[in-house]
Amino acid sequence: MVELKIACKLDGSCEKPRYRKYKCKVCGWVYDPLKGDPSQNIPPKTPFEELPDTWICPVCRGKVGKESFEPLDEWVEFDE
């Protein structure tokens, strides 16, 4: 499940969906969904929640996976 944060105004218009950045608790590397992870063929605009279960931290390499990442209070928007 992808966690979205959407803000809507009283007139019914809404802002673009926003996606969280995640930080490795071991090395501090930050996954930015706007950039993806080219080292593992993860394209830009891939939310963290949609990364495959086999994805690993590109800095720690094989030592830690998604379970070692924590959500940050930093969000990015995807342009259509």
UniProtKB/Swiss-Prot annotation:
The keyword Transport applies. One of its GO terms (molecular function) is iron ion binding. Residues 19-72 form the Rubredoxin-like domain. Pfam families: Rubredoxin. It comes from the Archaea. One of its GO terms (biological process) is alkane catabolic process. SUPFAM superfamilies: Rubredoxin-like. Keywords: Electron transport, Iron, Metal-binding, Transport. Gene3D superfamilies: 2.20.28.10. Coiled coil: none annotated. The keyword Metal-binding applies. Binds 1 Fe(3+) ion per subunit. Fe cation binds at C24, C27, C57, C60. InterPro entries: Rubredoxin-like_dom, Rubredoxin_dom, Rubredoxin_ET. Its cofactor is Fe(3+). Belongs to the rubredoxin family. Rubredoxin is a small nonheme, iron protein lacking acid-labile sulfide. Its single Fe, chelated to 4 Cys, functions as an electron acceptor and may also stabilize the conformation of the molecule. This is Probable Rubredoxin-1. It comes from Methanocaldococcus jannaschii (strain ATCC 43067 / DSM 2661 / JAL-1 / JCM 10045 / NBRC 100440). The lineage of its organism: Archaea, Methanobacteriati, Methanobacteriota, Methanomada group, Methanococci.
